[in-house]
Structures are given as C-alpha cells and as structure tokens.
Amino acid sequence: MKLISIVVGVLFVVGVAGVFGGASAAGSAPAVGAAAPDFTLNSQENKPVSLHDFKGKWIVLYFYPKDFTSGCTVEAHNFQRDLAQYEQKNAVIVGVSVQDEDSHQKFCTKEGLSFKLLADTAQKVSSQYDSVMTYNDAKFSARHTFLIDPQGKVQKVWLEVKPDKHSEEVLAALTALQGASASK
C-alpha cells in the first residue's frame, strides 16, 4: 500500500509539472497587468530595437524556438499574413529567438517577413519573460506570446501556443481588449 501511495504521489507531481512546468521552472513570466520588462536587442537589420520604442502601440511579443523550422515558419507566415490587420489596430509584431541577426535576416528574406525579429543570443530577454527551454543541452526560446498594451502593461499571455492558429487567437484577443478599453 505504501508503494502505491508513493507511485501515486510521484505521478501527481509529474502531472502537475507537465501541466504547469512549461519551458522553465522559474515561473517568472510577467503576469497580466504587470509592466512588461523593457529590453534592447538587435534586429535582423543588425540595429538595436527596444521595447519602449513601441510605446503608444500594442505589441505582440512572441518568442519562438528556431528560424526555418516548420512550426516557427508557419507561425511567422501567419503573423505576416495578418500584419495589415494588426497595423489597423495600432499593433506591431515583434519576434524573439536565440538565433543571431544573420539567421533572422536570412529567415525574413526567404520567408518574406517584414516585421522585426530580434536576436536574443544570450537568452537574457527570453529569461526575463520565462521563455527559455532546453533541448539536448541547447537553449532555445520557448513558444510563448505576450500581448502588451500601449502603456507597456501585459494584457494577455499565451504559454501554450499552436502555431497554425495562433495569429488568429492573438488578433481576436487584441480586438476584444481594444473593445473593452473603448467601452470604459
């Protein structure tokens, strides 16, 4: 009986970790209502871009594992497809991953992406947003998204992202949040 209790306890802990663990154990992702941590990283044009550069706009800050991989390419294509709708809603798309500026530039050129991709090669910003994952001893940005309002506050967080429908989810949330703000 004691063995069964131990097994059940271990399975419970593993199950909870699987549901809530995400990409890292720190649990320090900015919460809804919190100020989004500011940062500066180089873009695919090898120019510094800071979060505060977009003050006054809605920001879709999305972290993704790797340029040129299937899920990341689908997610980027969908954000690009919907970019005009985001722009009509005073929103910008900003992608972050651990690849360097050259990789991002090649990815943007090959895939026809016109929004900013930022190089977080030291994983500092990914860590600030609790969006680092490790796979085979390599570190990547986890697939997380933060919707930040024009005042720099986090309004929505996605820690479970399905790349094929994600842009549509973000657009719907942005529309709902803007509607709620307008009615206040």
Description of each model-found segment:
Residues 52-73:
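Short active-site neighborhood of thiol/selenol oxidoreductases, capturing the structured segment around
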Residues 30, 39-58:
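A short beta-strand-turn-helix
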Residues 4-6, 10-38, 182-184:
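N-proximal helix/coil linker or "cap" segments that precede and/or mark the start of modular domains
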Residues 36-37, 58, 142-144:
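Short loop/turn microsegments at loop-to-beta-strand junctions
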